[in-house]
């Protein structure tokens, strides 16, 4: 059983955090939350998504899981207005998700959870660098970097967080000293290189966050963590590095 109501914009932003990386996902539902874990087809990026029942106006559920075609789901959510109320109901007989919003009524066919790729385990990473900054700042850096290259370095050097991209002809570098960050902790200088294709997808959601925590090492995956739904949800992205040649 699953029946809930929530602000449409809040829910759309939450689901977008998953749909930026994968086209389908298995969502686990409990009496307290909705969660999902997914990895992209190339095994380069992973997302962990948790949305607490407190994010909803009403929330009634028993333990279960559903498979959702995120492309179709986001098409429906894209029809909602910012202040619309979104009502969700899992029809137990048809195994379809009934969606009502702004006078519109949709019925979304669900996927067999067993047909969806197995959920990944989120690795516990202890990395030497931890940077906290505004999501819009990181999004701006990614947008600048993609003008000159298809990959981007994230690093910390001498208490300064930097973003750097270098192409065949051009180079861009953004430096943010510790004083201009929300916080910075680093036991050593660190640097890793990442695909801008993935970063560009990730910042679509991450760029809206007031605070993003970046856990960073050298030639290690980067971990991005931020809150959604006014602190009633959390999204974690993990992105594998591109190893720089000497």
Curated annotation (Swiss-Prot):
Role summary: Sliding clamp subunit that acts as a moving platform for DNA processing. Responsible for tethering the catalytic subunit of DNA polymerase and other proteins to DNA during high-speed replication.
Record key words, sorted: DNA replication, DNA-binding
Quaternary context: Homotrimer. The subunits circularize to form a toroid; DNA passes through its center. Replication factor C (RFC) is required to load the toroid on the DNA.
Organism: Methanocella arvoryzae (strain DSM 22066 / NBRC 105507 / MRE50)
GO BP of this protein: leading strand elongation; regulation of DNA replication
SUPFAM superfamilies the record matches: DNA clamp
NCBIfam families in the cross-refs: PRK01115.1-5
Protein family: Belongs to the PCNA family.
Lineage: Archaea, Methanobacteriati, Methanobacteriota, Stenosarchaea group, Methanomicrobia
Record's keyword annotation contains Chloroplast: no
Source organism superkingdom: Archaea
The protein, known as: DNA polymerase sliding clamp
GO MF terms, alphabetically ordered: DNA binding; DNA polymerase processivity factor activity
């Amino acid at each position: 059983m699953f029946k809930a109501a929530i602000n449409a914009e809040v829910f759309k932003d939450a689901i977008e955090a998953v749909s930026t990386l994968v086209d389908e996902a298995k969502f686990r539902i409990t009496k307290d939350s909705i969660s999902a874990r997914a990895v992209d087809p190339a095994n380069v990026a992973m997302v962990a998504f948790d949305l607490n029942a407190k994010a909803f106006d009403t929330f009634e559920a028993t333990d279960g899981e559903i498979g959702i075609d995120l492309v179709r789901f986001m098409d429906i959510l894209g029809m909602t207005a910012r202040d619309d109320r979104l009502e969700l109901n899992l029809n137990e007989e048809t195994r379809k998700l009934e969606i009502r919003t702004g006078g519109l009524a949709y019925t979304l066919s669900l996927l067999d959870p067993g047909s969806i790729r197995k959920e990944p385990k989120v690795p516990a990473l202890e990395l030497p660098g931890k940077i906290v900054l505004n999501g819009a700042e990181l999004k701006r850096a990614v947008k600048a970097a993609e003008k000159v290259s298809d990959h981007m370095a994230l690093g910390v050097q001498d208490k300064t967080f930097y973003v750097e991209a270098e192409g065949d002809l051009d180079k861009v570098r953004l430096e943010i000293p510790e004083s201009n960050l929300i916080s910075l902790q680093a036991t050593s200088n660190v640097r890793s290189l990442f695909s801008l294709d993935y970063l560009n997808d990730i910042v679509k959601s991450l760029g809206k966050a007031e605070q993003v925590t970046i856990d960073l090492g050298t030639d290690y995956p980067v971990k991005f963590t931020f809150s959604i739904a006014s602190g009633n949800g959390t999204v974690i992205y993990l992105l594998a590095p591109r190893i720089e040649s000497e």
